[in-house]
Design a protein with these regions (language model features):
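Internal intein/HINT superfamily modules and their associated LAGLIDADG
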Residues: 1-216
Length: 216
């Protein structure tokens, strides 16, 4: 599209309630916002390893009217290892500026103070698909990889999980702090996020865990 056409098109864009829940969820995970005009508008950038390509395509589908170019392969680097990723970005838009002010302080991503008020079960599901996993094959425990956040951010996220009735606490690792959701909360966790987890991510919420594994 030409620039005038793009600007005219952008005036028609409004985030739906579902899209807002998804945006909050992926921002809690690996997605990030970028501004090129001092915060007047932002674009959302999504990038995942190629093994999560179906998840990236799903996010693209959910946000399609906000994206001018379909997901593309790109090279990335994780802990010094070159990776093949799939990525896309939205148009830069004023409606995303509110999320920029919520999620960023001095260019560092933070957890909004009001996250408990804006997080929903769908938000939790997208955060988990984006940046969570089962603790192990021998446990019902769930891990959120929150190592990039500081202790106050992690406390807010634990408050969110506890607000959903889940038992959660900090789990210190060499590279930072993860959040651990107790196996005793697994059934409730699975019921919360299950309706929103896409087929390609079902392995993260295995049904067999509900009856066959101890609640560690």
């Amino acid at each position: 599209m030409r620039s005038r056409t793009i600007e005219a098109y952008k005036t028609t864009l409004r985030l739906t309630d579902v899209q807002r829940e998804i945006v909050v969820g992926v921002l809690l995970g690996d997605a990030h916002l970028e501004t090129q005009n001092g915060g007047r508008s932002y674009r959302l950038k999504v990038e995942q390893g190629h093994r999560h390509a179906e998840y990236v395509r799903h996010l693209y589908s959910e946000l399609r009217e906000w994206v001018l170019t379909p997901p593309k392969q790109k090279m990335g680097k994780t802990k010094g290892v070159i990776t093949l990723n799939l990525a896309f970005q939205t148009v830069s838009h004023e409606e995303l500026a509110s999320y920029g002010s919520l999620f960023y302080r001095a260019r560092r991503k933070v957890v909004p103070e009001q996250i408990r008020e804006i997080a929903t079960a769908r938000t939790l599901a997208y955060w988990y698909m984006d940046d969570g996993s089962m603790k192990s094959r021998q446990s019902k425990g769930v891990i959120f990889n929150t190592q990039a956040y500081d202790s106050s951010d992690i406390r807010r996220l634990i408050d969110v999980l506890e607000g959903f009735g889940l038992e959660a606490w900090e789990r210190r690792q060499s590279d930072g702090i993860q959040i651990y959701v107790s196996g005793s909360s697994y059934e409730q966790f699975a019921e919360l996020v299950g309706p929103y987890v896409i087929e390609a991510m079902r392995y993260k919420v295995p049904l067999t865990r509900r009856t066959q594994l101890p609640k560690r």
